[in-house]
């Protein structure tokens, strides 16, 4: 039976009452709201109190409080992180050292030095000052390579790789190195009539092919194909991601990385890892005694004092990156500096061409006798160190005396090569390209040349420095023997190729457009 009108109104009234809070409910809700608001206000107050206390402690009570530096950097790590992510960190350090002096507090618990007196304590102490793990890249297979391994493993790696990077090893590998450099000259000759070339690209191709042959038993084929191998092309993206990854790790948010990292980057890293593994497995299948870096190293199970497969993978990646980037970066920077200083270029060209009667005389041994070339490369290394930031170390328990001042245990310290080598405290006319400073010129007698340590010092100095020097000398000598060089000014524009570069662990090099005019020889052979 249908409800009457009175019954319908009564039902509607009861339904609406469901949404009308009773007096008790209102009181309860007010109580909860007040509690939430009070908790929020208390949280904000606690955060504000913690912030003020932290700021006060770091500025006025912290053991590093007496060291000079910008207040914001002393208060928080955020300005440092911002600088690294933006790629301006090297230039920022240079600016800060010019403003505050030879030692600067660049973070609440970190000091930066630009004086050679700090080098010995930081990099040559016994026991060693450990590397700061927050400044190291993550390892894709969980096994640190030679760049990040603990002392006992680092010593073992160096011992196993020592022969391959020694003078004797270099001479044994000379035919391999020479073959790639001759191919570089051939390819440059073939392309020189097509307009200006990006010389950065060609240097990269040559040095990657050489180190690929030495580290993996075969080159990347860059010079043969005149194009960049996929593995090499991905390096820039991976390296640029390291400062961001390290910033996230510093806040103990490692779990966030897979969630926010671009899928393209994650896939790229996975492909790179697989590529390296395949190359190592291929090298293992060939056995020992191939005349490359792995002779005497291989020990797949890691039971005979050699390297396990996982260690070979980690070290293979590190060797390829360090062994190629160092040489190609310096050659690029040196070429730019020579083109900006035509008198130096002319003198070096005359030096090379006057030292040989035929290109066949130019080899690893003969170029080692070119004193002016050595001075040119040393000066380029000073102004444009391929690894512009030295590794950071942590002061051992008990503290240390660095550059005449006490530094407490746990402090992160480093000597900044770029800032140190451009300091007027260390070099006369520091921003000028003057190779004569390395040739006993009396004008530069007071230069503190030991400041320039582009390959670091101590037990962890660059094991491949002899290879890098040999490559740089031989490549530069061959190019100056065969070609006259000229900057493509219209294509480059007014920009300063060197000073405009950002740094994400390595220099972010833009194209350097150069015209190469083949030299006309009256006789050859």
Curated annotation (Swiss-Prot):
Q: Which UniProt keywords apply?
A: Glycoprotein, Heme, Iron, Membrane, Metal-binding, Monooxygenase, Oxidoreductase, Transmembrane, Transmembrane helix
Extract one GO molecular function annotation from the record. averantin hydroxylase activity
Induction (record text) = Expression is positively regulated by the dothistromin-specific transcription factor aflR.
State where heme binds.
462
* Gene from which the chain derives: avnA
Q: What is its main location?
A: membrane
Cofactor(s) required for function per UniProt: heme
Give the species. Dothistroma septosporum (strain NZE10 / CBS 128990)
**Entry's transmembrane regions:** 36-56
Q: Which reaction does it catalyse?
A: (1'S)-averantin + reduced [NADPH--hemoprotein reductase] + O2 = (1'S,5'R)-5'-hydroxyaverantin + oxidized [NADPH--hemoprotein reductase] + H2O; (1'S)-averantin + reduced [NADPH--hemoprotein reductase] + O2 = (1'S,5'S)-5'-hydroxyaverantin + oxidized [NADPH--hemoprotein reductase] + H2O + H(+)
Entry keyword Heme? yes
Name of the protein described by the UniProt record: Averantin hydroxylase
Protein role? Averantin hydroxylase; part of the fragmented gene cluster that mediates the biosynthesis of dothistromin (DOTH), a polyketide toxin very similar in structure to the aflatoxin precursor, versicolorin B. The first step of the pathway is the conversion of acetate to norsolorinic acid (NOR) and requires the fatty acid synthase subunits hexA and hexB, as well as the polyketide synthase pksA. PksA combines a hexanoyl starter unit and 7 malonyl-CoA extender units to synthesize the precursor NOR.
User: Where is carbohydrate linked to this protein?
Assistant: 315
Pathway recorded for this protein: Mycotoxin biosynthesis
User: What membrane topology term does the record carry?
Assistant: Single-pass membrane protein
Source organism, top-level taxon: Eukaryota
The subcellular location is:
Membrane
């Amino acid at each position: 039976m249908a409800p009457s009108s009175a019954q319908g109104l009564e039902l509607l009234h009861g339904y609406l009452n469901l949404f009308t809070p009773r007096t008790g409910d209102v009181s309860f809700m007010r109580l909860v709201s007040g509690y939430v608001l009070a908790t929020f206000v208390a949280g904000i107050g606690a955060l504000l109190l913690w912030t003020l206390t932290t700021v006060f402690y770091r500025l006025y009570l912290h053991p590093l409080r007496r060291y000079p530096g910008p207040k914001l950097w002393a208060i928080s790590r955020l300005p440092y992180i911002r600088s690294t992510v933006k790629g301006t960190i090297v230039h920022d350090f240079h600016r800060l050292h010019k403003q505050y002096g030879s030692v600067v507090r660049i973070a609440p618990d970190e000091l930066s030095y630009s004086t050679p007196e700090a080098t010995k304590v930081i990099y040559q102490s016994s026991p060693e000052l450990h590397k700061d793990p927050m400044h190291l890249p993550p390892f894709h297979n969980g096994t640190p390579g030679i760049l990040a391994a603990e002392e006992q493993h680092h010593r073992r790696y160096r011992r196993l790789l020592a022969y391959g990077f020694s003078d004797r090893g270099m001479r044994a590998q000379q035919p391999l190195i020479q073959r790639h450099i001759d191919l570089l000259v051939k390819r440059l000759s073939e392309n020189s009539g097509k307009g200006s070339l990006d010389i950065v690209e060609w240097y990269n191709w040559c040095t990657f092919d050489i180190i690929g042959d030495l580290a993996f038993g075969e080159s990347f084929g860059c010079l043969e194909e005149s194009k960049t191998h996929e593995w090499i092309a991905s390096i820039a993206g991976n390296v640029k991601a390291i400062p961001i990854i390290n910033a996230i790790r510093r806040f103990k948010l490692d779990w966030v990385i897979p969630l926010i990292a671009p899928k393209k980057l994650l896939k790229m890293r996975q492909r790179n890892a697989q590529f390296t593994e395949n190359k190592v497995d291929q090298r293992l299948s060939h056995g020992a005694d191939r005349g490359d870096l792995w002779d005497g190293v291989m020990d797949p199970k890691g039971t005979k004092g050699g390297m396990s497969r996982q260690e070979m993978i980690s070290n293979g990646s590190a060797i390829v990156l360090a062994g190629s980037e160092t040489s190609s970066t310096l050659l690029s920077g040196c070429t730019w500096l020579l083109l900006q200083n035509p008198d130096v270029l002319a003198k070096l060209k005359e030096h090379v061409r006057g030292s040989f009667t035929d290109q066949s005389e130019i080899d690893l041994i003969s170029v080692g006798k070119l004193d002016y070339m050595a001075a040119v490369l040393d000066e380029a290394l000073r102004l444009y160190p391929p690894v512009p930031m030295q590794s950071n170390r942590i002061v051992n328990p008990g503290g240390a005396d660095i550059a005449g001042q006490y530094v407490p245990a746990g402090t992160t310290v480093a000597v900044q090569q770029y800032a140190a080598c451009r300091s007027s405290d260390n070099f006369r006319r520091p921003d000028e390209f003057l190779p004569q400073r390395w040739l006993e010129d009396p004008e530069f007698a007071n230069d503190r040349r030991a400041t320039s340590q582009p390959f670091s010092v101590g037990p962890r100095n660059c094991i491949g420095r002899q290879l890098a020097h040999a490559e740089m000398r031989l490549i530069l000598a061959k190019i100056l023997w065969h070609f006259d060089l000229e900057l493509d000014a219209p294509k480059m524009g007014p920009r300063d190729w060197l000073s405009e570069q950002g740094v994400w662990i390595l220099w972010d090099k833009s194209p350097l457009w150069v015209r190469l005019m083949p030299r006309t020889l009256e006789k050859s052979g």
